[in-house]
């Protein structure tokens, strides 16, 4: 499943294609959404927001399309009039004069009013988004030490969208490697330096992934280009200590770590 950085990049692509342009055609596969098609013609997308792995497409008439790709959903941007060759099932089409965005295969799709946005079950449940620039390491530390989360092992906590939205398995693995901790630790057992390091890594690693993953110009990022240090690298030497990276299972997901420098 894509994690927060991948969802945010998808949102950026959708915004770049149709933001601010009048919609010339709108189509929804689900019967309960059909009545919104005519209401959106002539409106435009004001912005595309991410809440962890959910995507909110906001329209100029104050309606918001909620979608969660889960395992199989995918957005595509095409030239208007182009029909991609795919076996996927089309769920949503938002068309402008020159670009069209298409959502395939997703099943979790709703249209929300401003009032419904504030009461939607998933949106109520998720924590702050790690890519939200307003989220600070201080707030991340407060959440780590809160009664709700301080006794949770990191193996499960860093996959829980109620803690911080947008984290997933590769980010969990890379964050814990960055701070030299294993997944069985709890926030209540860390010292001040460890807490500070973890609070920063919880935000820095996802933001670096969003900004630079897939880029090839290392000079632009002064060597800070995001790349996996342990994820999918079992059997290889750890670049920090030379130990051999191992793979196990934690919270029902593959977990990669270095026993030489993660304790």
From Swiss-Prot:
SMART domains: Fapy_DNA_glyco (SM00898), H2TH (SM01232). A zinc finger (FPG-type) spans 229-263. The keyword DNA repair applies. The active site is at residues 2-3, 53, 253. CDD domains: EcNei-like_N (cd08965). GO terms for molecular function: class I DNA-(apurinic or apyrimidinic site) endonuclease activity; damaged DNA binding; oxidized pyrimidine nucleobase lesion DNA N-glycosylase activity; zinc ion binding. It catalyses: 2'-deoxyribonucleotide-(2'-deoxyribose 5'-phosphate)-2'-deoxyribonucleotide-DNA = a 3'-end 2'-deoxyribonucleotide-(2,3-dehydro-2,3-deoxyribose 5'-phosphate)-DNA + a 5'-end 5'-phospho-2'-deoxyribonucleoside-DNA + H(+). Gene3D superfamilies: 1.10.8.50, MutM-like, N-terminal. Its cofactor is Zn(2+). DNA binds at residues 70, 125, 169. SUPFAM superfamilies: Glucocorticoid receptor-like (DNA-binding domain), N-terminal domain of MutM-like DNA repair proteins, S13-like H2TH domain. Binds 1 zinc ion per subunit. Its EC number is 3.2.2.-, 4.2.99.18. It comes from the Bacteria. Keywords: DNA damage, DNA repair, DNA-binding, Glycosidase, Hydrolase, Lyase, Metal-binding, Multifunctional enzyme, Zinc, Zinc-finger. One of its GO terms (biological process) is base-excision repair. Belongs to the FPG family. Involved in base excision repair of DNA damaged by oxidation or by mutagenic agents. Acts as a DNA glycosylase that recognizes and removes damaged bases. Has a preference for oxidized pyrimidines, such as thymine glycol, 5,6-dihydrouracil and 5,6-dihydrothymine. Has AP (apurinic/apyrimidinic) lyase activity and introduces nicks in the DNA strand. Cleaves the DNA backbone by beta-delta elimination to generate a single-strand break at the site of the removed base with both 3'- and 5'-phosphates. This is Endonuclease 8. It comes from Escherichia coli (strain SMS-3-5 / SECEC).
